[in-house]
């Protein structure tokens, strides 16, 4: 049985796009960032959904491009004393939870996530308290405070396996915050899942009718879909998976044309993985609607070259992530529980986020 907890639909105010830099300014900030990384004993870790020039700079300077959990784990294994996290705020918090001894900086602390914003800790706590018989599973795309309330934290690549495991133990689930991913794991597992009603502003916009028209234009194309997308879109996919899983699918699928339903930032690493293939964004407009995100997270777009340089140079309250130690310890419990479960299954945990 699956129930849906309805909360008021939210229209999140989008941040202003960064002022574009000209070629000379880009070159200036790239060199400045390289210098500051050395001066601050820092490493740049970037999410798959940041702009291509940021991902390229992370690779060029010895950092990494990955999902949120792998970003934090890379930082843990790297000797640098400072992590510059190019992503959204919960990613910086996750890095700090797993690396308390390191300084964690971000280009801006105002880079939000609609899944995080759509799951405020007080409301979520009250919801969980009203269903005390359920095991609480939260997606990685949540605040440290929400993680601290959970029994498990999960990434998209291991979500189905974990819910199947909990279902086999007879446990009923609270799932938060993404309703589409919750619906996907419920359908795959058959578990009793009560979903919080959140959504990613990017994936929520993918449209079935528009995708069908695009598929008609490219009948030989494979469709790759992130499970944060609506179920009707997921049902059209040739491959469904997390960011890392979609990149792997792009490599292994025989089709030379790919229609990709996730943030277009992933195209940088996906094209690296299969340079001989042609990639198209799945449509986010149509069916009587215009796109708001247009397949790119507006908060990810805040991680520009100028902002990264300012984060490294200024630090302080505008850029440094702090997580209360008691809260960090509480959030670490469900995170470690997930990692231990993954190790038992001999799975490599790589998920969106």
From Swiss-Prot:
Organism, per UniProt?
Yersinia pestis
**One BP term from GO:** 'de novo' NAD biosynthetic process from L-aspartate
Q: Reaction catalysed by this chain?
A: iminosuccinate + dihydroxyacetone phosphate = quinolinate + phosphate + 2 H2O + H(+)
The EC number(s) given in the record are 2.5.1.72
**Chain's role:** Catalyzes the condensation of iminoaspartate with dihydroxyacetone phosphate to form quinolinate.
Q: What class of enzyme is it?
A: transferase
Which InterPro entries does the UniProt entry name for this protein?
Answer: NadA, NadA_sf, Quinolinate_synth_A_type1
Which residues of the sequence carry a binding annotation for iminosuccinate? 47, 68, 139-141, 156, 226-228, 243
GO CC terms: cytosol
Instruction: Give residues annotated as binding [4Fe-4S] cluster.
Output: 113, 200, 297
Which GO MF terms are attached to this record? 4 iron, 4 sulfur cluster binding; metal ion binding; quinolinate synthetase A activity
Q: Which family does it belong to?
A: Belongs to the quinolinate synthase family. Type 1 subfamily.
Localization recorded for this chain is: Cytoplasm
Name of the protein: Quinolinate synthase
- Keywords in alphabetical order: 4Fe-4S, Cytoplasm, Iron, Iron-sulfur, Metal-binding, Pyridine nucleotide biosynthesis, Transferase
HAMAP family attached to this UniProt entry? NadA_type1 (MF_00567)
Which coenzymes or cofactors are required? Answer: [4Fe-4S] cluster
Q: Does the keyword Repeat apply?
A: no
């Amino acid at each position: 049985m699956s129930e849906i907890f309805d909360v008021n639909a939210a229209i999140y105010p989008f941040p202003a796009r960064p002022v574009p830099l000209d070629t000379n300014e880009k070159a200036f900030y790239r060199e400045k960032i390289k210098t500051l990384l050395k001066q601050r004993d820092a490493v740049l870790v970037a999410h798959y959904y940041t702009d291509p020039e940021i991902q390229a700079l992370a690779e060029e300077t010895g950092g990494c491009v990955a999902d949120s959990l792998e970003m934090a784990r890379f930082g843990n294994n790297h000797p640098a004393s400072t992590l510059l996290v190019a992503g959204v705020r919960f990613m910086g918090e996750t890095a700090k939870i797993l690396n308390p001894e390191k300084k964690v900086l971000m280009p801006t602390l105002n880079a939000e996530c609609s899944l995080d914003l759509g799951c405020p800790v007080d409301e979520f706590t009250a919801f969980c308290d009203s269903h005390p018989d359920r095991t609480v599973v939260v997606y990685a795309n949540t605040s440290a405070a929400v993680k601290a309330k959970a029994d498990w934290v999960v990434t998209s690549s291991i979500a189905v396996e974990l819910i199947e495991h909990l279902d086999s133990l007879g446990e009923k689930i609270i799932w938060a915050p993404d309703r589409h991913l919750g619906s996907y794991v419920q359908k795959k597992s058959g578990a009793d899942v009560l979903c919080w009603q959140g959504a990613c502003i990017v994936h929520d916009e993918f449209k079935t009718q528009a995708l069908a028209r695009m598929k008609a234009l490219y009948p030989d194309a494979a469709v790759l879909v992130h499970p944060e997308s609506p179920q009707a879109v997921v049902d059209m996919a040739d491959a469904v998976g997390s960011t890392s899983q979609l990149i792997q699918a792009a490599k292994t699928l025989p089709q030379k044309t790919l229609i990709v339903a996730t943030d277009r930032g992933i195209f940088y690493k996906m094209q690296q993985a299969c340079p001989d293939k042609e990639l198209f964004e799945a449509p986010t407009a149509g069916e009587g609607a215009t796109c708001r995100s247009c397949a790119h997270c507006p908060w990810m777009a805040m991680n520009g070259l100028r902002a990264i340089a300012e984060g490294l140079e200024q630090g302080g309250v505008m850029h440094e992530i702090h997580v209360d130690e008691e809260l960090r310890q509480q959030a670490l419990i469900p995170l470690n529980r997930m990692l231990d479960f993954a190790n038992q299954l001999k799975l490599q945990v790589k998920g969106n986020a």
